[in-house]
Amino acid sequence: MPRVHHSLSNQAFLVLLLFSSIASAAIVEHVLHVKDVVVTPLCKEQMIPIVNGSLPGPTINVREGDTLVVHVINKSTYNVTIHWHGVFQLKSVWMDGANMITQCPIQPSNNFTYQFDITGQEGTLLWHAHVVNLRATIHGALIIRPRSGRPYPFPKPYKEVPLIFQQWWDTDVRLLELRPAPVSDAYLINGLAGDSYPCSKNRMFNLKVVQGKTYLLRIINAALNTHLFFKIANHNVTVVAVDAVYTTPYLTDVMILTPGQTIDAILTADQPIGTYYMAIIPYFSAIGVPASPDTKPTRGLIVYEGATSSSSPTKPWMPPANDIPTAHRFSSNITSLVGGPHWTPVPRHVDEKMFITMGLGLDPCPSNAKCVGPLDQRLAGSLNNRTFMIPERISMQEAYFYNITGVYTDDFPDQPPLKFDFTKFEQHPTNSDMEMMFPERKTSVKTIRFNSTVEIVLQNTGILTPESHPMHLHGFNFYVLGYGFGNYDPIRDARKLNLFNPQMHNTVGVPPGGWVVLRFIANNPGIWLFHCHMDAHLPLGIMMAFIVQNGPTRETSLPSPPSNLPQCTRDPTIYDSRTTNVDMSY
């Protein structure tokens, strides 16, 4: 009898817990107006597309468990999608916002509503345009706090402060599609260039602090093409999360963020009352390519309460722009917070193993054209010697859902077509080397069974020049089991992989001339993009996509698309049924 009573008590407790969980969730609604607006971060007026009249765009605040509803109204002259960078999109792949992958774009004078649940995630993420180069000016912070009543796994800070780092060009964003992309004119902190640049000396981000208080810095690298070092003069910070995954607290005086990465770090105002610079500088990782000699730090200010206005700010010592050891030391020392909120152990059994080479290459110069790349060709990029071609007639997700052929091929290779000394490319290449320099152009995907564990060795190559590539996976976090330089050794290096508390990311920088080992569980059906997060490399084709098949239940299967999903084609027969079986290869 007591056992029955105990069971009933458990049932009552579970019902109460479920009710409490539902009651704590909310529907959070926003409207994003995309318009072309004139702004002047430096000396020159520039017409750019921005959201709700601000650069960066509005910060979106939610709690874990909430439903986010965002109405995007496109009043700009550009096609637009919004990607929710790092959000899992469980059962909502149609809301991922990857242009021509999960949806066709929102065309000018049109609108679309994104709606999805925030499940199993806490921390700082970002939202941004996912049409090439529009991310430069269409972006903002997405902050996910714990459910009501649940604390952070660290002492509550006095204040939370978003810091968004940006890259600025005094030119039309359409020109950024050139190969290679033009060099940026400045970097910004929360939309301000600071005192290193003309015409902006009085426009600098200021963070006012109280001595002895702690501040949670929610740091986002929204720069289009550049890794960034970040430092605060005379202050250390404690990293507590990366890519919205809690970490073992890590004390450091310098951080590096790849494009698309986020860091949550606690700053303690523990220095004498005064004024201190915070600064960012670009990290130039390309081996053999000298860093720009006129690289300027972009600065903001930490101003202590009681500081006199006449005092000169203390300057930080910044690492050299090509300081690979400092970048690697920071990136490789982060570990996950074992037992923390949403932590899960590393799966030991692996179902799919892939070895993916990555890097730059060449694309034949069109006849009657002048190309400025090496050997008078156009720059290209590839994964396993495949240059990814983005579809133009219909999104890949729709093609998959409606069984439309001719849009992509299910043949992305698990291995590169040729084994060679990946990190040391010959100065006088052989015929086979030349083949590797001119990758195949194809829209390739890799199909994975639902709930499979996938392990990927990402090997950077020295074709043209090795540089760090920030690889971003949509729809999942992945375990980063190890980093290294040189060619990955499947015996020696595999023994050193961290299977206990590896860091987890949605975006990771592959070291120049080195490798990274990733592992993730494919538990989210749909088509998910995997690509370099330097936008200059998107048109070069450093990307591929995974198709995760349906699971055994309705809850683990791909949902139908929303009725108002933007369409690329006016042909209504394509959308009649899931067995349309149209061929769009023409």
From Swiss-Prot:
Give yes or no: UniProt keyword RNA-binding: no
GO biological process entries: lignin catabolic process
| Entry GO MF terms | copper ion binding; hydroquinone:oxygen oxidoreductase activity
Position of the signal peptide: 1-25
One Gene Ontology term, aspect cellular component? apoplast
Compartment annotation: Secreted, Extracellular space, Apoplast
Name of the protein in question: Laccase-9
Q: Which organism is it from?
A: Arabidopsis thaliana
Q: Which gene encodes it?
A: LAC9
